[in-house]
Amino acid sequence: DENIRDYLKKINTRREPKVLLKYFQYLAVLFTEIYLDELKNRKPELLASLNMFLTEYGREHDLGGWISEFIEGDLSKIAFWMATGSGKTLLLHINYHQFLRYKIFSPDNMILITPNEGLSKQHCEELQKSGVPCRLYGGSLSDISGHLREEGILIIEMTKLVEEKKGGGVTIPVEVFEGKNLLFVDEGHKGKKSEAQTWAKLRNKLADKGFVFENSATFGKILSEANTQTLEEYSKAIILDYS
């Protein structure tokens, strides 16, 4: 609780009126705080407890084994399924401070992925209000070079990320973000089904060896028994469902 008060103090330094967490926001922050503490200090125990829970839950609800055991790689992503208007943006600001407090690793890049330019600008304005260093991707590689942790969060639309750049334009290949990335994803699955699958592959490349905070109000649109891989991924990642 003391840590959470400290995060609020940091993001409220420039804000008027001051932010107060609603109960579901507090729970999201608290669950994340506990999770990151376990991940940093007791990873083997965390993995064992998750698999024990999965075994017991699967037995009680007859899951039929469609969710495999947790492995270490599953621990590098947490997701928030929260309704529109529930303050997901604010949680992102606190998640930023939580990750830096626990120092899971020192990120080579910090990236916020959004579905469109309008949301990118909105995120940039709100992050600045909270005193979180950030900048928008302006369409040039010069915006990327040297974009290390001390320079803050780079905000970019998912539509501008590609696996391999062909020709000119504002797109950028994910390979330029080398190393361990701290990735924030806002509604990153929006789009046509084929687009969503392509974007998911690009996100996974960016997140390789890194860590992901993802939030959405519409996970239900992509979660179905027909797509068992995605269903399993988010069944393991969602830390709070307030949809």
PLM feature spans:
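Conserved Walker A/P-loop ATP-binding site and its immediately adjacent core
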Residues: 90-94, 105-131
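Walker A/P-loop NTP-binding motif
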Residues: 31-36, 86-105
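Signature of the SF2 helicase/ATPase Hel1-core->accessory helical subdomain module
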Residues: 92, 96-101, 125, 155-243
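Conserved H-loop
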Residues: 85, 115, 217-218
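Conserved pre-motif I regulatory segment
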Residues: 1-81
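Inter-Walker segment of RecA-like/P-loop motor cores
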Residues: 128-167
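Short loop/turn elements that form and flank the Walker-type P-loop nucleotide-binding site
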Residues: 35, 74, 106-107, 149-150, ...
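Flexible phosphate/Mg2+-sensing switch loops adjacent to catalytic phosphate-binding sites
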Residues: 39-75, 102-111, 122, 137, ...
